[in-house]
């Protein structure tokens, strides 16, 4: 999914890749992994987002895919979960040994000021070129797609591991009423669960 943010003369185009799949080797997961690998090579800057103080086997696998020469920022998200800031220093040293990160950005993605600071850090890495999208565009996806992803995300959030990762939300009918969207009714529940 492409996210677009235009601030002044700068346009940020974020490529949100699916998570790298290490547990299952299904055709879907292989396809998702191929998408991740393709996206990593076609960007001007990589934002490697991990939970502050944590590093998983899946994180290590993704990190091993990064091509040299692409600036990479280590984004330590959920900094509020680290009780003492001094606890982060050994983790940060370990991360620097794993990869030559260009910069370290501690933050909380829930804080608007942290997001603005991150955009300010990213801006100098972007090439000077014409914009790819209009100033008011937020994504390259349709509203129908965004609605289906919102429903899917809510299903995962409220059902946890009960819902298989391969689940898909299909919207049969999508009505736009003014500035309000009417989300579809959930039907054929038996088709949702295997």
Residue ranges and their predicted role:
Residues 6, 41, 45, 67-71, ...:
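Non-catalytic alpha-helical coupling and interface elements of nucleotide-dependent molecular machines
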Residues 20-29, 80:
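Flexible beta-alpha connector loops of hexameric P-loop NTPases
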Residues 16:
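Conserved active-site aspartate in kinases
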Residues 70-73, 80-145:
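Canonical P-loop GTPase G-domain recognition
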Residues 26, 53, 109-112:
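Short, surface-exposed acidic/glycine-rich loop or hinge patches that mediate macromolecular interfaces
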Residues 5-12, 30-104, 175-179:
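Conserved C-terminal guanine-recognition region of P-loop GTPase G domains, centered on the G4
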Residues 143-194:
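P-loop NTP-binding site
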Residues 1-2:
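Conserved substrate/cofactor phosphate-moiety recognition/catalytic segment
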């Amino acid at each position: 999914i492409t996210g677009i943010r235009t601030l002044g003369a700068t346009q940020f185009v974020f490529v949100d890749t699916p998570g790298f799949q290490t547990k299952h080797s299904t055709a879907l997961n292989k396809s998702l992994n191929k998408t991740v690998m393709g996206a990593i090579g076609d960007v001007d800057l990589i934002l490697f987002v991990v939970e502050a103080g944590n590093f998983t086997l899946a994180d290590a696998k993704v990190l091993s895919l990064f091509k040299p020469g692409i600036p990479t920022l280590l984004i330590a998200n959920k900094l509020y979960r680290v009780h003492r800031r001094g606890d982060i220093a050994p983790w940060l040293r370990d991360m620097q040994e794993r990869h030559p990160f260009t910069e370290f950005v501690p933050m909380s993605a829930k804080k608007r000021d942290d997001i603005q600071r991150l955009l300010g850090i990213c801006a100098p890495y972007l090439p000077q070129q014409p914009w790819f999208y209009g100033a008011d565009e937020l994504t390259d996806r349709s509203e129908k797609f965004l609605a289906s992803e919102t429903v899917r995300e809510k299903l995962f959030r409220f059902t946890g591991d009960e819902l298989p990762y391969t689940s898909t939300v299909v919207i049969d009918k999508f009505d736009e009423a003014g500035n309000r969207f009417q989300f579809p009714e959930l039907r054929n529940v038996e088709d949702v669960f295997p």
